[in-house]
């Protein structure tokens, strides 16, 4: 894993509070194979939500070949990052929170095809040179106005999303 903090503003602009410290400890101290046991023992919604392998099912319909480059915008604690790393050639994550990026990095520390960029998408996007086959915004798009500085942040995020994927765009929406 590469954890790139070049665009990190120096402080996390959002946090779920103390539970993130607990999640950081879990990602650091337990192997992914132990997460189900930890979830069962802790009986905590945030731990279930962020560490359950079930969330990876959201990717099951995508016809990966293993040669794709994927951009995961808003990767959070890495709930689907591991599944992307298993299915794609390269995965680049963008995450605003340093703590969540560290959680993601710890839990996927054995992945050699993972790069996590910490900072605001608008700042990082300026320096992206890769073209991506797939771009995910899982659980992120609805927060666009919180981190996209624009009169129309949802349109801006969509346009940036398209720019980053133009060379290899694949539409699997069924339309």
Predicted segments with their positions:
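Conserved SAM-binding strand-loop segment of SAM-dependent methyltransferases
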Residues: 110-122
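A short SAM/SAH-binding and catalytic strip from SAM-dependent methyltransferases
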Residues: 134-151
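A short acidic, Gly/Pro-enriched loop at the edge of an enzyme's catalytic core
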Residues: 126-135
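Conserved SAM-binding loop of SAM-dependent methyltransferases across substrates and taxa
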Residues: 77-88
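Conserved class I S-adenosyl-L-methionine
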Residues: 67-76
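N-terminal auxiliary segments of SAM/dcSAM-dependent transferases
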Residues: 1-29
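A short glycine-rich, Lys/Arg-flanked "PGG" loop and its adjoining helix->strand segment in the class I
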Residues: 152-170
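Conserved SAM/SAH-binding beta-strand->alpha-helix loop
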Residues: 97-99
């Amino acid at each position: 894993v590469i954890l790139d903090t070049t665009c990190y503003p120096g402080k996390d602009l959002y946090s779920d509070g103390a539970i993130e410290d607990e999640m950081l400890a879990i990602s650091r101290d337990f192997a992914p194979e132990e997460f189900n046991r930890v979830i069962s023992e802790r009986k905590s919604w945030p731990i279930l939500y962020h560490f359950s392998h079930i969330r990876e099912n959201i990717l099951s319909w995508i016809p990966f070949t293993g040669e794709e480059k994927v951009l995961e915008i808003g990767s959070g604690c890495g709930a689907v990052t591991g599944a992307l790393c298993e299915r794609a050639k390269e995965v680049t994550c963008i995450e605003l929170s340093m703590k969540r990026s560290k959680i993601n990095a710890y839990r996927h520390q054995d992945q050699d095809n993972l790069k996590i960029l910490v900072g605001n998408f608008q700042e990082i996007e300026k320096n992206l040179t890769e073209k991506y086959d797939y771009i995910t915004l899982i659980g992120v798009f609805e927060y666009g106005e919180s981190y996209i500085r624009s009169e129309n942040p949802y349109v801006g995020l969509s346009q940036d999303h398209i720019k980053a994927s133009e060379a290899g765009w694949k539409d699997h929406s069924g339309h």
